[in-house]
């Protein structure tokens, strides 16, 4: 029997497992598919909410703490696994921002570098970017990570740890209860028992918890993205315009996203989204009209009310914990939300006030 059973092998589940394993706990992690291959793979990897000043304090608090973790985490994983998560801090250009006064006020309150810039500044930073039609902002400290590589590195590190057992292609079929207490799960690979359970199921978390008659308000929200194969160096930093973004990778791939679709668990791609994403991409970087689209894919975000994740123990099952519902910001919030959960699991002083994230009866109603 493990100390902890983690259900879900995305970035949230794997970071939870890593922190618990670092603390000497025995961990079993079960994943219905392959670790790091759902939303953790499908996203863009920007280590910030797209427009951070538009979020409430619960999301902002997690984001602020998490942003500072990625440089060290990426170096650690590269050293331990040889896989480079490609954390890069080259800043972000916001084009056509209609609430720039609010953004600058937010930045001043936090002491965060953010400045209003003109078309010549934009051209200096990104010569191929379209001239901004309205206000433009520059955030020099923003970073991004190559999230598929981050997932690979986390999985490789966990697989090498003697106190971690990874079980992939392992579907949870129900919870095992004895004398009113949850002691494990039934899976297609047999029973898995543990003292404490952590549900990190992303968009599937609500489905999992139906087995305990818990109604978790987390739903799948589809996002489609495309990637261009462009000459290396065409774009150097993240550029965001009208809610869509271009993210450069070191090998010349340029990611463009993303749609927001209420489509259940459907992950199919379609021509309408492709046309829309190409139009957005060419409005940001006109030269992309001459570059081929190399990839088109979709992922499922775990949508939740106000994008505030559920982090903590279930009211009626004190040894069953949740860490789910991060919506568009799973990668962004993962270091802080997993640290906060592990604080609760190990009885440590919490990183921050856990109250806004607790899965209370009121939030589950």
Question: Where are each of the predicted segments found?
Answer:
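Short beta-strand to alpha-helix junction loop
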Residues: 61-64, 94-100, 138-156, 268-273, ...
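Dinucleotide-binding Rossmann-like beta1-alpha1 core, especially the glycine-rich loop
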Residues: 46-125, 280-282
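Helix-loop-beta segment of a Rossmann-like dinucleotide-binding subdomain
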Residues: 82-94, 105-108, 113-161, 183, ...
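Glycine-rich FAD pyrophosphate-binding loop
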Residues: 21-43
